[in-house]
Amino acid sequence: MEPLGSTLTATYAHPQPAATNFLPAIGTLTSSYRNRFPHRNLTHSLSLPWRPSTYYKTAYNYPTLAPLSSTSQSVCESTMLPFVSNRTTLFTRYTPDDWYRSTLVGFQESNCSRHNSERLRVDTSRLIQDKYQQIRKTQADSTQNLGERVNDIAFWKSEIIHELDEMIGETNALTDIKRRLERGLIETDAPLQVARECLFHREKRMGIDLVHDEAEKELLTEVETVLCCQERMRRHLDKAIAQLASDRSAQHELEKDLSDKQAALRIDDKCKHLRNTSQGVSYFRGVENVDATVSVPESWAKFTDDNVLRSQSERAASAKLREDTENLLIVIANEMWNQFNKVNVAFTNRIAETVDAKNKIHIHLSKTLQEIFQTEMAIESIRKAIKEKSAFLKVAQTRLDERTRRPNIELCRDIAQLRLVNEVYEVDETIQTLQQRLRDSEDTLQSLAHTKATLEHDLAVKANTLYIDQEKCMSMRNSYPSTLRLVGFC
């Protein structure tokens, strides 16, 4: 027998090798008449499920009738009580010693059975208490583990919420800078259009004024500057769009993780507060064998940590892109305004040069007109002088012609004749000289007229240039967008 207080693995809980029957062995038919009890065949199975196993296990170890059976075999026939068929010898089967011995054996077996039962009850009670305390401790440990799990989930949930708030703020800020970039890109279309229209209008200059001057060079530089600025803005806009997509992807992962954390927190918190008396507690057979887990604590924490780190990385890249975009807008606005001012200065200088040239042309034209007038007056004077000299020539020639009609010897080559001849030559030479001067004056007048026409054409060209540069180009450039509009604030 095991000592008192042993566990359920004590020997009384396990059958020991014994006889397959709880009754004494039955001998032959002749010897059976000397036994205490008559022979009877068993009419029931010894292995039926309704019999108490503890009793029969004990009976296997301590058969109550075995001593009597063995004793009855040793009793001599002279001491045995005969049956009715042998009444002539004795009327009893056993002696008082057998009776006392049998009673003592019964008492001993009763004491042993009670002792075993008492020990079983004590061990069972202690087992119940031990298992109860063990189960309570296990449940408390599970509750504590659930509490720690709830704390872990709550911690990561707070981290996700904090990072999600930061990411939402960064996404909104990047969206704002993207909108500013789009507005700034739209605002650059007007300066580009103005510069191109200025170049187009300046193609309508005439003559020598169709020159590749400083204003045109600055206009071409302005077009290149605006196009370069637009290209940089488009590249940053594409980067902002891609970064926004990355931010929203990271934000979506955080929101999904947060939703999972909230559901897990709700479930684990409910499990933490479940008690034996709680509503909804029931049996779920085999649930402990179902392993639907997809992560371990390390991979679980790493998953959320990776999401947070990814969000932080995307947020840092977004902040860097915002800073670069902000600086780009300021640089672009300054570059465009600097080039705008250079173009305006070039236009101002060119307009001043044109105005000065126009004024000088006016002066030359005035002088030319004055000279034309004086030349015309001189021509009139020459013509009048020629006309006057023609009268002298006619008188002298008439005199000579009349003197040719003198008779005979009167045709004398006298002083008067010689003087008249000289007078004719002198007056004719004078007329020829005056006619030459008249021709020269007329040629000069033609030259002056050509100069006048040239000056008038140049004056018209300069007036057209001034109209294009001053009235058209500079008037369009008065509507250049402000710096605030170029950086996208308006």
Curated annotation (Swiss-Prot):
Location of this chain's protein in the cell: Cytoplasm, Cytoskeleton, Cilium axoneme; Cytoplasm, Cytoskeleton, Flagellum axoneme; Cytoplasmic vesicle, Secretory vesicle, Acrosome outer membrane
Pfam (any one): Tektin
One record GO biological process: cilium movement involved in cell motility
Keywords for this protein: Cell projection, Cilium, Coiled coil, Cytoplasm, Cytoplasmic vesicle, Cytoskeleton, Flagellum, Glycoprotein, Membrane, Ubl conjugation
Region forming the signal peptide: none
Coiled coil ranges: 419-456
Posttranslational modification: N- and O-glycosylated. May be proteolytically processed during the epididymal transit of spermatozoa.
Assembly notes: Microtubule inner protein component of sperm flagellar doublet microtubules. Interacts with TEKT1, TEKT2, TEKT4 and TEKT5. Interacts with CCDC38.
Record-given protein name: Tektin-3
